[in-house]
UniProtKB/Swiss-Prot annotation:
The gene is fmt. It comes from Neisseria meningitidis serogroup C / serotype 2a (strain ATCC 700532 / DSM 15464 / FAM18). HAMAP family: Formyl_trans. It holds the Pfam family Formyl_trans_C. Gene3D superfamilies: 3.40.50.12230. GO terms for cellular component: cytosol. It catalyses: L-methionyl-tRNA(fMet) + (6R)-10-formyltetrahydrofolate = N-formyl-L-methionyl-tRNA(fMet) + (6S)-5,6,7,8-tetrahydrofolate + H(+). This is Methionyl-tRNA formyltransferase. Attaches a formyl group to the free amino group of methionyl-tRNA(fMet). The formyl group appears to play a dual role in the initiator identity of N-formylmethionyl-tRNA by promoting its recognition by IF2 and preventing the misappropriation of this tRNA by the elongation apparatus. Its EC number is 2.1.2.9.
Length: 308
């Protein structure tokens, strides 16, 4: 069975490797163009391209697929049975969706129809969801509205960051899409069910500004945001005129004026919130490395009563 693969980041690279390891023929891999990255802004290949080249696969990097006759012709010439799409980042027009014999399967990191859109992992943590998961979806022209082929649940742990949930769902998604491809190969079809009309939510793209901590919110809400926005865009506060990223924190039952430092020690930097307080245990000063609060407090002293 011939499988086109389309994806860009690590989440997708894991799936590509799994599909290849399962023995499926992959005549073409689509990924986004190389982009400048890092402090030196060096042109860097996306993880999917790196994985594809290691596997000896053909790679194409079109800037767009919509109104791109050359890319469409390339897809048609492959005569693929199915396309697997994972965090590709480009819109697939209807003519692309229709090109493979069995259409396009998408690996989506939520329990659809909850958290359709760009940032499902982060929004699930931010909202305090007890669980999330992966859906393998038969793609249609809508935004994550296609029929669901399979659903795989994951319990969000109380200390899980977006990075940790990402890594867990990355492995779940890779195994899930291989299982569904094997079913398609053996039976010649997939049993997909329509998404419920109720329970639809949208996972809007993250912004740096929304990651700025508002101390008037409850400590529980802020703590979830810290985990949801870790590693990027990273929850932050202004400290000495510069942004300081907050990496880990926990809720404590203390009270004070919102944004007021209640104590600073090797155990934690405690800041009052709209309800309860937050004990910060790991942070990252502007231009510096991540550090635990003991290392931070050793070189700085923040007086109780200071406003953040």
């Amino acid at each position: 069975m011939k499988v086109i693969f389309a994806g860009t980041p690590d989440f997708a690279a894991a799936a590509l490797k799994a599909v290849a390891a399962a023995g499926f023929e992959i005549p073409l891999v689509l990924t986004q163009p190389d982009r400048p990255k890092g402090r030196g802004m060096q042109l860097t290949a996306p993880p999917v391209k790196q994985a594809a080249l290691e596997l000896g696969l053909r790679v194409a990097q079109p800037e767009k697929l919509r109104n791109n006759a050359e890319a469409l012709q390339m897809l048609k010439e492959v005569e693929a049975d199915v396309m697997v799409v994972a965090a590709y980042g480009l819109i697939l027009p209807q003519e692309v969706l229709d090109t493979p014999k069995h259409g396009c399967l998408n690996i989506h990191a939520s329990l659809l129809p909850r958290w359709r859109g760009a940032a499902p992992i982060q929004r699930a943590i931010e909202a305090g969801d007890a669980e999330t998961g992966v859906c393998i979806m038969q793609m249609d022209i809508g935004l994550d509205t296609g029929d669901v082929v399979s659903e795989h649940r994951y319990a969000i742990q109380p200390t899980d960051t977006a990075n940790e949930v990402h890594d867990a769902l990355m492995e779940i998604g890779a195994a899930a899409v291989v299982a569904d491809l094997q079913q398609l190969q053996s039976k010649g079809r997939l049993n997909a069910v329509k998404q419920p009309e109720e329970g639809v939510t949208y996972a809007q793209k993250l912004s740096k500004e929304e990651a700025r901590i508002d101390w008037s919110e409850s400590a529980a809400v802020i703590e979830r945001k810290i985990r949801a926005f870790n590693p990027v865009p990273a929850a932050w506060v202004e400290y000495q005129g510069k942004p300081m990223k907050i990496r880990r924190a926990e809720v404590v039952a203390q009270q004070g004026a919102a944004g007021e430092v209640l104590s600073c020690s090797a155990d934690g930097l405690v800041v009052a919130c709209g309800e309860n307080a937050l004990k910060i245990t790991e942070l990252q000063p502007a231009g510096g490395r991540r550090m635990n609060i003991a290392a931070f407090a050793a070189g700085r002293h923040i007086e109780a009563g200071t406003k953040l």
